């Protein structure tokens, strides 16, 4: 039983990391283009790097004896 739970947690962490890398690579050019267009209104944001990082919340099941 613990092996199945550990496998699911490992799968979730790998999936989260892969999504973060893919999201960062695909989102970065888009956000740079959008911020360059709006640089006059928000110059602070044009100098910052932005990344899409998904967050997975793992909930532990508690069973009362």
Curated annotation (Swiss-Prot):
Superkingdom field: Eukaryota
CC annotations in GO: chloroplast
Entry's localization field: Plastid, Chloroplast
Keywords from the UniProt entry: Chloroplast, Plastid
Protein name as catalogued: Uncharacterized protein ORF62
